[in-house]
Amino acid sequence: MQCALFDAGRCRSCQWIEQPVSQQLSAKMTDLQQLLAAHPVAEWCAPVSGPEQGFRNKAKMVVSGSVEKPLLGMLHRDGTPEDLTDCPLYPASFEPVFAALKPFIARAGLTPYNVERKRGELKYLLLTESQLDGGMMLRFILRSEAKLEQLRAALPWLQQQLPQLKVITANIQPVHMAIMEGEREVFFTDQQALAERFNDVPLWIRPHSFFQTNPTVASQLYATARDWVRALNIHHMWDLFCGVGGFGLHCATPQMTLTGIEISPEAIACAKQSAAQLGLTDLHFQALDSAEFATGQGRVPELVLVNPPRRGIGKTLCDYLSQMAPDFIIYSSCNAQTMAKDFGHLPGYRVERVQLFDMFPHTAHYEVLTLLVKS
């Protein structure tokens, strides 16, 4: 992938960009094989990859510069701002949005937040696009509520320019720290969630719910988990750290009892909405801590699917899964190091199948799906 920002030394986020994608994939496979060297793997599936550019459905832009000439991108370590609106990881559909947002910031009088001086209002712009219909969610991350009415008054102009903006919000983040968002969300649109669809499964994206940034590869990840579960003829499963329900909704059948657990109430609201659309009545999504839920249950499911954050599931949950002993565990990981460590705490299971998903081209990161079978 050619990138003018990288060539000019202005951005180094894609550290592997100079390697061909095939070479990147080989290096990732080697890394994964080394991490799992202590665990014999019965079947290595071919890695899955997607487009090498224009694949992101989300932009997280630091707003800097001046109100008349805002920059949308990032801050270097020394505080120097960098405009990244030309980043080739973004689809072409983002270009007109960035182009309209710059004059809009001036029209609305949203002074970019200056980290050094601790002054200004607009900290970040977060943009998410649905693959279903090109609808978008735009979030203004503000330091305070001081400019809310000014922003509200200016929005009709922006909505006229960009009718694809289906959900528009302001998030209030008053803390002078590198925290992306605060708890208070103010909606400027009647619509509060973005409709998405992967493999004919309806999904919903709300402001505070996590959603994968590479939809092409994510849809293949969910479809693979579905195929693995269907082949096992499962009637009762848990989906822990379920997010908006991507895995559980793909795996569920009308004959199956499924419980999905996620700490975020917003994500659970999305999952419930999808389950209702699919007419699946034996799906139960609850906003709880996954480890606390699991350790408090009596009835043992045949399969437990886990999709934890980078820290992994940890020894406590591993020990409980070992004690509970479901027949199968499907582990989806964005950090193979912590996944391998967790496998060390699951001695009663063998690694049946492993597949790498190249969710983050041009970087060392990848996603991996693993099927564990009770020995």
Curated annotation (Swiss-Prot):
Q: What is its EC number?
A: 2.1.1.189
What reaction does this catalyse? uridine(747) in 23S rRNA + S-adenosyl-L-methionine = 5-methyluridine(747) in 23S rRNA + S-adenosyl-L-homocysteine + H(+)
Q: Which GO terms describe its biological process?
A: rRNA base methylation
Give the family, as the similarity comment puts it.
Answer: Belongs to the class I-like SAM-binding methyltransferase superfamily. RNA M5U methyltransferase family. RlmC subfamily.
SUPFAM superfamilies associated with the record: S-adenosyl-L-methionine-dependent methyltransferases (SSF53335)
Q: Which domain of life is it from?
A: Bacteria
NCBIfam families, per this entry?
meth_trns_rumB
Alphabetical UniProt keywords: 4Fe-4S, Iron, Iron-sulfur, Metal-binding, Methyltransferase, rRNA processing, S-adenosyl-L-methionine, Transferase
Which residues hold [4Fe-4S] cluster?
Answer: C3, C11, C14, C87
Pfam families reported in the protein's UniProt record: tRNA_U5-meth_tr
What is the name of this protein? Answer: 23S rRNA (uracil(747)-C(5))-methyltransferase RlmC
Its biological purpose: Catalyzes the formation of 5-methyl-uridine at position 747 (m5U747) in 23S rRNA.
Which residues are involved in binding S-adenosyl-L-methionine? Q212, F241, E262, N307
Report the GO molecular function annotations: 4 iron, 4 sulfur cluster binding; iron ion binding; rRNA (uridine-C5-)-methyltransferase activity
